[in-house]
Amino acid sequence: GTLIRSLFHPFEEADKWPAVQQYLDILNENVADPKIALLGMQSFSSWLLFATAANACGEANDGVLTRECVLTAAADVDDWTAGGLHAPTDPGPEGGAAPPCGMLVEVNSDGEFERYFPEIGSSDDALDGFSCDDDSVVDVPANEGLGKVSPDQPI
């Protein structure tokens, strides 16, 4: 099957990760015939970040929310997991550095995701089912490929 790198715990492992199960429960309790997809969980993580930042602003400013306060509070977060939905990320003002943690999942013949790497609880499992290696992140200079492919294949 096809291997995919993921920063999010797969739905198929919801029994192991309470935040994923809570996300699925919220959908099933509040949405008729929910369409379970990773994009929804990514959006939920973004919403949780907004809610967390808005809550911090409300507490700091007697219940008053301003755009500037919410953006600043969100930018101050540098180890975001959405309560355990995904590996730690830095959603800072420039999107933060690429996260060094992830996992590989394989799409099986039924179209479901099966963990490929790391095995949970193994020495490769550095953090809640994710493998974390700072060497897995490399800087790619802007426009590195521009004009360097070949003259007959312009970008």
Give short role names for the model-derived ranges.
Residues 1-155:
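Extracytosolic ligand-binding ectodomains
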